[in-house]
Amino acid sequence: MYGFNCIFLMKSRNPLISVGVLCFLSARRKAQFKKAWRDAPLYPGDPLVFAANVTLDEATAHPALLVSERGRRVTWQETCQDLPSSTQRFNSIPCVLGQLRINSGRACWEVEVGDMQSWDLGICRDNVTREGVFTMSPQNGFWAIRLYDGDYWALTSPETSLPLRERPLKVGIFLDYEAGDVSFYNMTDGSHIFTFPQNTFYGVLRPLFRLWSSDSGSLTICSAEGECTDVVIHMPTLQEK
């Protein structure tokens, strides 16, 4: 089983180095990169896997959330839409799920949060409750982090305070299904935000997004083709020891 780590690369004159993300590195490589991730080699022989192409599932969106035509942006609106009742739709907490359904393998995506003051981002099981008020926690099928009124939290039970050295303008979510690993990274400075304790996943997982009525802004999913940033994942070739 591989450990989970990401290395964010800055601009370089070396044509082999691009702005992006190196993920899923073995323990040996993590040790190499721990103190000087900016100078880490790329191992260009590794196979490449590109970021997941995530769009929003409008059928799951709370009536106060407006999903863009392309399905990449969700915006809070004060007046709820008049929508038919559906068991797929969140009817109390303003959430929306991604179309992507994951039951194996690895996936990552990036979300532009900008200067918003409040949001939740992460993953959840496809069968989580969507009616009424509920607590987001791994015990209830949610693995997410939260920004609320300037403070960052991991939605563990109880919640874990996250002291960040720099405010993220973009957040990277990285999932390794078989390893039971969910990690979050600040795509602004390349720093690690939080990794949930190892889980044993079962069933289908989906990207999760939440807005708050206290902050009427938008969340934008970056495209797999690099609409927000150039994201490239290198898979490991060395086994972790």
Feature map (PLM): residue ranges:
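Beta-rich ligand-recognition domains in immune and ubiquitin systems
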Residues: 1-241
